[in-house]
Amino acid sequence: MFKYIGDIVKGTGTQLRSLVMIFGHGFRKRDTLQYPEEPVYLAPRYRGRIVLTRDPDGEERCVACNLCAVACPVGCISLQKAETEDGRWYPDFFRINFSRCIFCGLCEEACPTTAIQLTPDFEMAEFKRQDLVYEKEDLLISGPGKNPDYNFYRVAGMAIAGKPKGAAQNEAEPINVKSLLP
């Protein structure tokens, strides 16, 4: 009999403690954000959607060197090189399968022209998996991205309309890397 009364007192105490705890949490600041109305805080170096940028002249920065595809641990990047009449390389097609991408950022680190960059955009939900395969037209943005003044061909040098490398306007003289060796 005393055991039965002890169980009732113990159960009532547990219920009262739970009610006090719930009542106390009702006046605290909410941890949950109302997502669409309140934007989510993202870290400054958050790695989200991948984009292809343009150089300051408005041309594609990508030179189809294939380093991003080689660096990708899951193999979600595919591209094919083409060449313009003046010898400039560009990707004939550039494709990223975001259903396989792990957003590790290795492609961005491998890119010598800073053409491929990760943005803080994370809203990429789709109903069909095929819609997560982005082509070059979907990835290209109108601006230069994180490095607005960098132009790969000004740094690397390229013969333009009969001029030798380094003789064009705003182009630095090419550096002989063998002269830099110790």
Swiss-Prot record:
Chain sites annotated for binding [4Fe-4S] cluster 1: C62, C65, C68, C111
Cofactor(s) it depends on: [4Fe-4S] cluster
GO biological process: aerobic respiration
Compartments where located: Cell inner membrane
Cellular component GO terms held in the UniProt record: plasma membrane
Keywords, in A-Z order: 4Fe-4S, Cell inner membrane, Cell membrane, Iron, Iron-sulfur, Membrane, Metal-binding, NAD, Quinone, Repeat, Translocase, Ubiquinone
Coiled coil start-end: none
Broad class of where this protein is predominantly found: membrane
Factors inducing expression: By low oxygen growth conditions, especially in rhizosphere.
Record-linked PROSITE patterns: 4FE4S_FER_1 (PS00198), 4FE4S_FER_2 (PS51379)
Enzyme Commission (EC) number: 7.1.1.-
Pfam families in UniProt: Fer4_7
Class of this enzyme: translocase
Topology of this chain in the membrane: Peripheral membrane protein
Note describing how the cofactor binds: Binds 2 [4Fe-4S] clusters per subunit.
Residues where [4Fe-4S] cluster 2 binds: C72, C101, C104, C107
Catalytic activity reported: a quinone + NADH + 5 H(+)(in) = a quinol + NAD(+) + 4 H(+)(out)
Gene Ontology MF annotations: 4 iron, 4 sulfur cluster binding; iron ion binding; NADH:ubiquinone reductase (non-electrogenic) activity; quinone binding
Subunit (UniProt): NDH-1 is composed of 13 different subunits. Subunits NuoA, H, J, K, L, M, N constitute the membrane sector of the complex.
The family this protein is said to belong to: Belongs to the complex I 23 kDa subunit family.
Protein name (Swiss-Prot/TrEMBL): NADH-quinone oxidoreductase subunit I
